[in-house]
Amino acid sequence: MTLIQAILLGIIQGLTEFLPISSTAHLRIIPALAGWEDPGAAFTAIIQIGTLGAVMLYFRRDILSIVKSVATGLWKGNPLHDGEAKMGWMIAAGTLPIVAFGLLFKHEIETTLRSLYWISGALIILALVLSLAEWKIKKRLEEGHPLKSMEDIGWKEALLIGLAQAIALIPGSSRSGTTITGGLLLNLSRETAARFSFLLSLPAVFAAGAFELYKTWDLITADPGNIMNLAVATITSGIVGYLSIAFLLNYLKSHTTSIFIAYRLAAGAGLLLLLGGGTILP
């Protein structure tokens, strides 16, 4: 991998990690189109630490408040004593499904499911489910029913959105895409669904990145070029990711996710055509 490739992959990761279009799909598709080697699941997991940093920086006040409140609640023997403490436990609960499924299906995630056929199918299927979620939200608003805010997220919402996050282990699904879709199906507002999605990503992305970094440390440090490429890609993804978070939260205040649905359908169909025509290999 060249330094230019590392920078481009970092930009791709930062742009697509938080938009519901799948960063893993793009990190798999674009190298295939460009004739580069597949960067691999480990590379993808490690550079996500950059986008993890973007979430921590953007939501730093929320995170500090949640951590402080959870600690206070534990000290006082009342874990759910306020909204911030409750949110901390909802994030913890929502993380359980992806941990369980990630450990159970780790081999398949890193091999079989990285096939471009799986990715194209995931792009299309989630677009259809997200379209259904948007229809449900539109109908609810037309009937005059309110949408849920962060304060309304309870155990049921946290666990179900956590299950949606576990589906994102299938490359092409999009972690933000599945969790935002899950939130919309549970009647969260678009902005609330996105905000909870980003906060929910923290434990899972940190754990995956740290694990892959530990597992591949000897391989990475064996070549100074590997260290440089990973560092550059990670930093680039963090900078671009921060801008993507700001964009999406602002965008969803007054827009639906229709543009992302259309993009996913076009990308999935286009990928199938390229595979069918032999332009790229699965």
UniProtKB/Swiss-Prot annotation:
Reactions it catalyzes: di-trans,octa-cis-undecaprenyl diphosphate + H2O = di-trans,octa-cis-undecaprenyl phosphate + phosphate + H(+)
Transmembrane feature ranges: 1-21, 39-59, 85-105, 115-135, 153-173, 193-213, 229-249, 259-279
Keyword Cytoplasm on entry: no
GO biological process, one term: regulation of cell shape
Major localization listed first in the record, in broad terms: membrane
Record keywords, A-Z: Antibiotic resistance, Cell inner membrane, Cell membrane, Cell shape, Cell wall biogenesis/degradation, Hydrolase, Membrane, Peptidoglycan synthesis, Transmembrane, Transmembrane helix
Pfam families per UniProt: BacA
EC number, as in UniProt: 3.6.1.27
Subcellular localization: Cell inner membrane
EC primary class: hydrolase
An example molecular function term from Gene Ontology annotations: undecaprenyl-diphosphatase activity
Keyword DNA damage in annotation: no
Membrane topology: Multi-pass membrane protein
InterPro entries linked to this entry: UppP
GO CC terms: plasma membrane
Miscellaneous note of the record: Bacitracin is thought to be involved in the inhibition of peptidoglycan synthesis by sequestering undecaprenyl diphosphate, thereby reducing the pool of lipid carrier available.
Family membership noted in the UniProt record: Belongs to the UppP family.
Its job: Catalyzes the dephosphorylation of undecaprenyl diphosphate (UPP). Confers resistance to bacitracin.
Protein known as: Undecaprenyl-diphosphatase
Organism field: Chlorobium luteolum (strain DSM 273 / BCRC 81028 / 2530)
